[in-house]
């Protein structure tokens, strides 16, 4: 029985905000942990525990007030979440899955062990090992932080010319090396698994990144059937090896030879799934809540032929003053989601917009028109 279920979310940012919005029609109440008073989720009705995300006492308080604990980002205290599991409460996805994904090297090892396609990689404990890896990777590779890397932060493309400097710039953090992949497209597959193991999958999307941050998402991606089927098969096989319920995002690279390699896994609702709010019968946010509470999963069919999303990022530092939203909403098929963040920072995700239409070209055009009208 899911009536009056209480969900706890570690993190109160925009992802928790959109989960809270989706919770209303499901009869679910939401409580979040977030260190910033008036966090985005609290602005749309979530109760908030003001505390650090990793605060052990706060996490236990959250579990006591709710039936199920989940996350809106993966850099959380998995030891505390495992303690919650040991009290008999449900945590989704499973803490061990979150912990595996937190370490990018163990994530690569997990993928390789399970026969899933991933770029060649090497553990690096010394700069000497990095030099050897660089030789093995034909003189060019990605040097990556194992922990706390996101939106391109914690990655560096290195060659013999800059390896030493890059290694030193990272400082005293754990690193690994990954073969440089000259991809032609970036893809993502959003899927959800319920507590019984049933998996549903959304159409593969294409993502466009600028400065390593997602700029635009096309639902569905402009892909041939072979590539689409291959991506969705890989995503399903990946999900079968993950533990716990909820939405997962599998990010991938497509090469010029139509080879697909997994870039990384996100154990949560994801930026690439935002077009599902307007574009799909069941949004990724509603789907996640259904999955973790034991409800029947919703349809992943599309409501429109095409949906295109664009992120609205900060271009300055200071107080947030959104302008042009009303004008943007006058464009056919456009919806705008502002996250209610008080402070704008360069590169910070302040909102997103989505345009739906009969074709990807039309949706993209309308989205770009709306995007040009909005200032933060």
PLM-predicted stretches and their roles:
Residues 230-250, 256, 266-317:
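Active-site "cap" helix and flanking loop/linker of ATP-utilizing ligase/carboxylase catalytic domains
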Residues 193-198, 255-258, 357-359:
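Short acidic-glycine loop/turn motifs at beta-strand connectors
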Residues 100-188, 192-238, 368:
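Active-site nucleotide/adenylate-binding loops and adjacent lid/helix of ATP-dependent enzymes
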Residues 3, 290-376:
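Peripheral (often C-terminal) accessory segments that flank ATP-dependent C-N-forming ligase machineries
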Residues 200, 248, 260-264:
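Protein kinase-like catalytic core scaffold
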